[in-house]
Amino acid sequence: KNMITGAAQMDGAILVVSGADGPMPQTKEHILLAKQVGVPNIVVFLNKEDQVDDKELLELVELEVRETLDKYEFPGDEIPVIPGSALLALEALIENPKTQRGENPWVDKIYQLMDKVDSYIPTPQRETDKPFLLAVEDVLSITGRGTVATGRVERGTLKISDTVEFVGLKPTQSAVVTGLEMFKKTLDETLAGDNVGVLLRGVQKKDIERGMVIAKPGTITPHTKFEAQVYVLTK
């Protein structure tokens, strides 16, 4: 459930596979889910490289990963695969948080991974010119500040002091935006593609729940009948 909720918001993903063990059953499940919910691009990190003494074994694991990606209609031959050790990189950064490129081989592997993410996963065109819409993923109550709804901005822009409506599941209500936050940074404005927390005035936590949307007033109407394409996942 959580994998589906998160994956549905992604422009791309990093698939982490143990270089020592190879693809596990949940690896295939995650690739399948990524395909079905529309994650367009994947980059692979072969973890635990430090535990593999035989380079040929690591190459066999990489080949197996590429074949698995092909099976689920990702371009296995093209997808970047970066070996490394998350643990050794983390230990190096804990010992010296200011470690730069070229100063530690394991930290360099993480830089290489992120370089591939930047080059292989394109930044999609964002629909910033359309009316604001955010799908609510979670709702929090912050003492003394108000109610915060978090989620991904599907389209449009939003600024502090804007009025919004929250629609679906319950009667439509409106509220004023008093704050915007993303990755512990406060914002004056949020754009399509951002994962953001929206602080709302004049609304209780019980009034909003996951599955609702926050939208520009008058732009979204709730419906009780619709057509959908559904994937049913079996164990």
UniProtKB/Swiss-Prot annotation:
Highest taxon of source: Eukaryota
One cellular component term from this protein's GO annotations in UniProt: mitochondrion
Residues making up the signal peptide according to the UniProt record: none
Protein name per UniProt: Elongation factor Tu, chloroplastic
One GO biological process term: mitochondrial translational elongation
Keywords: Chloroplast, Elongation factor, GTP-binding, Hydrolase, Nucleotide-binding, Plastid, Protein biosynthesis
PANTHER family xrefs: ELONGATION FACTOR TU, CHLOROPLASTIC, ELONGATION FACTOR TU-RELATED
Domain tr-type G: 1-125
Cellular localisation: Plastid, Chloroplast
Catalytic reactions on record: GTP + H2O = GDP + phosphate + H(+)
Organism in which the protein naturally occurs: Gonium pectorale (Green alga)
Residues bound to GTP: 47-50
InterPro entries found in the cross-reference section: EF-Tu_GTPase (IPR050055), EFTu-like_2 (IPR004161), EFTU_2 (IPR033720), P-loop_NTPase (IPR027417), T_Tr_GTP-bd_dom (IPR000795), Transl_B-barrel_sf (IPR009000)
EC number(s) reported in the record: 3.6.5.3
